[in-house]
């Protein structure tokens, strides 16, 4: 059985337009592949790219994101902003007549938290105290989980399938019936139609392939490679995979 491929794309609008301006866009249809498109903005230019993919018969998943100053990814910190972002997305979709195969929620720690953690050597006590406060604040997780679950129900009522893009460590939380990691770093475990585990081996060289072997069997889908674009925090190596590395990861992912 052939795997179903979904290409993640998180590019700023000018580069995005250039990428999808070539005739080769039809090749995505021949592959029966989908595109999960990062919604970095709600511009007319980005809408035109979506329309081009719609016309080519390529299924497009709306990968919802927030502005960097609001955390960029969805987490416990910005749950209240998720509904507003979705409402604005719906208005943009209706105005431009866009078609979506589903909606993706990227669940990761807040950008500011990652930046603080990266500066651990100069603000160690501050970040550790913040983590401790978050670990003991169980109500924060309960409240955010309810907000996101209500949002997911709304999305489904609107006719959308919902994906989450999760760090694989959420699997360990689930197996151990724990919420420690979620409370500590702001992740949240959510019931959705499809969970994609982000096993990006490019961030874990040279041990990346083991990441896929360890968690591949636990995900409905597996994310490999590196999405590029988006927010570059300078925390991890983001050099793209070579073709040899990518083909290796594709073969490993195919096993599951």
Which residues make up each language-model segment?
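Aromatic-lined carbohydrate-recognition surfaces of secreted/lumenal glycan-active proteins
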Residues: 3-12, 61, 132-181, 196-200, ...
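Substrate-binding cleft of secreted/luminal carbohydrate-active enzymes
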Residues: 3-5, 192-210, 214, 218-256
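Distinct, well-ordered alpha-helical segments
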Residues: 17-21, 172-188
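Active-site-adjacent "subsite" loops/lids of carbohydrate-active enzymes
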Residues: 46-95
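An active-site-proximal structural segment forming one wall of the substrate-binding cleft
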Residues: 77-107, 144, 184-189, 252-253
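Active-site groove signature of glycoside hydrolases
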Residues: 89-138, 256
């Amino acid at each position: 059985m052939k795997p179903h491929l979904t290409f993640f794309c998180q590019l700023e609008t000018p580069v995005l337009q250039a990428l999808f301006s070539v005739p080769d866009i039809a090749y995505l249809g021949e592959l029966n592949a989908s595109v999960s498109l990062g919604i970095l903005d709600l511009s007319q230019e980005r809408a035109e790219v979506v329309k081009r993919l719609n016309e080519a018969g390529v299924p497009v998943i709306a990968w919802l994101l927030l502005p960097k100053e609001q955390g960029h990814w969805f987490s416990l910190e910005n749950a209240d902003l998720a509904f507003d972002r979705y409402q604005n997305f719906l208005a943009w979709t209706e105005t431009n007549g866009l078609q979506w195969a589903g909606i993706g929620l990227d669940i990761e720690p807040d950008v500011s938290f990652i930046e603080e953690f990266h500066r651990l050597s100069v603000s160690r006590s501050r970040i550790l105290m913040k983590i401790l406060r978050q670990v003991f604040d169980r109500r924060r997780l309960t409240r955010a989980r309810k907000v996101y679950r209500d949002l997911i129900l709304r999305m489904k009522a609107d006719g959308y399938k919902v994906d989450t893009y999760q760090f694989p460590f959420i699997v360990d939380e689930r197996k151990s019936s724990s919420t420690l990691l979620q409370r500590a770093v702001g992740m949240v475990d959510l019931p959705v139609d499809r969970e994609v585990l982000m096993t990006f081996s490019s961030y874990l060289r040279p041990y990346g392939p083991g990441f896929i072997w360890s968690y591949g069997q636990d995900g409905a889908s597996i994310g490999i490679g590196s999405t590029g674009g988006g927010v570059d925090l300078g925390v991890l190596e983001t050099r793209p995979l070579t073709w040899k590395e990518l083909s290796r990861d594709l073969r490993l992912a195919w096993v599951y």
